[in-house]
Each structure stands twice: as C-alpha cells, then as structure tokens.
C-alpha cells in the first residue's frame, strides 16, 4: 500500500508548485478561490493598494526599492507595508496593485521557486523565473477585470550571463525586459522622471540607493498614494540589492543617512517644487 502511494505521488510529481495546486487544490490559489473568478462586482471594492516601486541596474547588479504606504480610496490604510521581497537567492519582486492578492501571489511565487529547486536539484534560470511569474499574473486576469489587478516588477542577477536584469509586466501577464531602470505604481511617472535625470551607467550600489531615495521623494511630492521617507516615525523605504553574492536588504541606518542627505540638500536649495 505504501509503495503504491509513493508510486502515485512520484507519477504525479511536477516541478511547478502552481501546477500542482491547480490540479489538486485549485481553491488554494490566490486567483482561483471560491467565488472570486465568477463574481460580478456591482461597485469597486475598497481594498488596500500598494503603490510605487522603482528598480535600476548598477555596476554589478540591480536594485529595487518601494515606499511604505498603502491606500484605500482617499484613506491611508498602512504606513508600514512592505512591497519588495526576495523571491529567492538571486531575485527580488516588487508589488503594485491590490495589496492582499499581490502579497499572496508573492508567497506563492517564492514557494514555486523553492519547490522547483527541490524537485529539479538546481535553480530555475532567471528567464524561467520571469516566465513563471508572467503565467501567475495571467491567472489573475479575471480578478484584474474586476479592478483587483496586480502589476509586479521583477529583478534578479543572471548567474549564467553575469549581469543584473529587470522585467516588467502588464495585467495580462505580458513580460517585458527593461534596461537601465523602470518604475511601476501610482507614483511611477514622477519617479521615472527623477530616474531619467539621476541615473547613469556604472552607478555604485551606494549611489543607486541614493538615486532610489530621490526618486521616491519625487513620487511622494506629487502622488498622495506614495509615502516618502518618514523622519518622524523613522520609516524608510524597503530597498534590496542583488548581485553575484545574492540578495541583500539595505540596512535602515544607511537608508536614514541617504534620506537625511536628500532632505538637507533640498532644504539648502530652497526647493518649492
């Protein structure tokens, strides 16, 4: 009996955890829970939304940063939300859109990559990770059509090519490789303007952190759904770097120092806008 069960499990084994859930427990998928896919919302749901994410390449890797504010309509739902997460040892994921679904999707993606490594005995390629994330977003399309969209930003270090790479997505799961830098979320247009002026090739990791802080400051200046560094509450953006050694979360003292430098520079300049 035990051997028969083991053989059955082996026969049904798949390197995709999402595929396994879709086949055996579809109700556990964040985009396939009972009643969600067929519901017709009469009015927009008031749920927390994550806002602005910025990412850029630097000399030897990639960086991703996100502000800490979540909004629900015209209300600040949270000042502490984290929107950038390590997907595995060599990649990070930033979320914009419906916060609850985005966080569930992030956890599923983390398990997906861990499951693949356990089954196959090797890491999935960065290209493969980007493709699998696109397939997950495509699965959320019915909810996106109801206004519960998730639009992530994915970045990682390609160990085979020895470079950092950035990928953006649309709500249909379309995957697009970006170069130099990219932004998503409600404040993205303002953050992108800052990146166009401040980014340059071969930034150091420390310089990239400073550029990301500047971009989030600019986004928070003009977008009420984006929260800039909060010096009163000592709340700083979540920032990750990824290089040949893996992912690293930038320490809060470094973020505090970079934020203070931006504030002092703008105070001296007497900037009003």
Swiss-Prot record:
Protein name: Proteasome subunit beta
Functional description taken from the UniProt entry: Component of the proteasome core, a large protease complex with broad specificity involved in protein degradation.
Notes on activation and inhibition: The formation of the proteasomal ATPase ARC-20S proteasome complex, likely via the docking of the C-termini of ARC into the intersubunit pockets in the alpha-rings, may trigger opening of the gate for substrate entry. Interconversion between the open-gate and close-gate conformations leads to a dynamic regulation of the 20S proteasome proteolysis activity.
Ranges of Polar residues composition bias in the record: 1-19
Cellular component GO terms held in the UniProt record: cytoplasm; proteasome core complex, beta-subunit complex
GO molecular function: threonine-type endopeptidase activity
Prosegment location in residue numbers: 1-50
Catalytic activity: Cleavage of peptide bonds with very broad specificity
Enzyme nomenclature, EC number: 3.4.25.1
Enzyme class: hydrolase
Pathway: Protein degradation; proteasomal Pup-dependent pathway
GO biological process, one term: proteasomal protein catabolic process
Compartment(s) of residence: Cytoplasm
Active-site residues (renumbered): 51
Chain positions covered by the region annotation Disordered: 1-23
Alphabetized HAMAP family for the sequence: Proteasome_B_B
Keyword annotations of the record: Autocatalytic cleavage, Cytoplasm, Hydrolase, Protease, Proteasome, Threonine protease, Zymogen
Complex and partners: The 20S proteasome core is composed of 14 alpha and 14 beta subunits that assemble into four stacked heptameric rings, resulting in a barrel-shaped structure. The two inner rings, each composed of seven catalytic beta subunits, are sandwiched by two outer rings, each composed of seven alpha subunits. The catalytic chamber with the active sites is on the inside of the barrel. Has a gated structure, the ends of the cylinder being occluded by the N-termini of the alpha-subunits. Is capped by the proteasome-associated ATPase, ARC.
Family: Belongs to the peptidase T1B family.
Principal location class: cytoplasm
